[in-house]
Amino acid sequence: MAKNVVNVVKLQIPAGKATPAPPVGPALGQAGINIMGFTKEFNARTADQAGMIIPVVISVYEDRSFDFVTKTPPAAVLLKKAAGVEKGSGEPNMKKVATVTKDQVKEIAETKMQDLNAADVEAAMRMIEGTARSMGFVVED
């Protein structure tokens, strides 16, 4: 018999740094998840991606067991890392803060491909370029 999912929790947590402290602990506690069990398993699974923010989707079942799926880091995080900046522009149409190349955009699009609803890499690249422009980045050939 299949277990029924009673709750789905979505979080963005730094890789390898999940702790029972807020915001992770309260979100998991409300869902009835074993907080220490989740943090140990998440940290072990994401230890190789240190420094990245990892989105995670946690499915909670009737018997309070859970499983989770880690996604690829958000496009904005990957773009900031590629451009070497801390944050995007507050006024992206006025102030440009960084430049990324088409090759960097293609690399990010290939990384994100499994999580994007794009038919091919070119469509994924257009999505990533749009994110870059909205952050105040210039996309160069």
Curated annotation (Swiss-Prot):
Any one GO molecular-function label of the UniProt entry: structural constituent of ribosome
InterPro entries from the UniProt entry: Ribosomal_uL11 (IPR000911), Ribosomal_uL11_bac-typ (IPR006519), Ribosomal_uL11_C (IPR020783), Ribosomal_uL11_C_sf (IPR036769), Ribosomal_uL11_CS (IPR020785), Ribosomal_uL11_N (IPR020784), Ribosomal_uL11_N_sf (IPR036796)
Pfam family, one: Ribosomal_L11_N
PROSITE patterns recorded: RIBOSOMAL_L11
Lineage top rank: taxon: Bacteria
GO terms (BP aspect): translation
PANTHER family found in the cross-reference section: 60S RIBOSOMAL PROTEIN L12, LARGE RIBOSOMAL SUBUNIT PROTEIN UL11M
HAMAP family on file: Ribosomal_uL11
Protein name (Swiss-Prot/TrEMBL): Large ribosomal subunit protein uL11
Native source species: Ligilactobacillus salivarius (strain UCC118)
Gene that specifies this protein: rplK
